Amino acid sequence: MFQSDLFPAGEQLPSMPLAYAIGTRVAALLASGRHLTRTDISGLFADKTGVMDWGSAWTIDDYNNAVEIGALLWLRESSRIGLATSIHEAEARFDWLEAALPPRHVRSEAQVELQQFSTPPMLAWLMAKAAAVCAQDTLLEPSAGNGALALWGCLQNA
């Protein structure tokens, strides 16, 4: 089962974390074929919190997590990418995803201090493909991230 603090299992948490709530909306917009801008994502936060700019109701960490969670949810639910997908086909879909999301050049001081940098989605996929992850495997997500490495194991029921 794929689970982390930002991908709750069942009814474990009393409320949905803000970054996950926004991430689900990002994934739905991606699934509809939409490309998103920073303003679009800030607008999603504004819809949820009433505040358009980060700083009080939401943080740059929330923003980065929401975008990453949205991408991971889209990869899991809508991308049609699996470990059997050809490199060329997967690359085209990963390229679309990268073009559909705004670049994330801003990191919080805590992220920089702790050297928290996201695993690029295609790199995580390539690692799982090279490892030939299968249902008999047990995977551990070694990072403090949102599960980019564990996602592909989840799709293989590992």
Language-model region placement:
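Short acidic, low-complexity intrinsically disordered linear motifs used
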Residues: 2-5
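Class I S-adenosyl-L-methionine
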Residues: 7-157
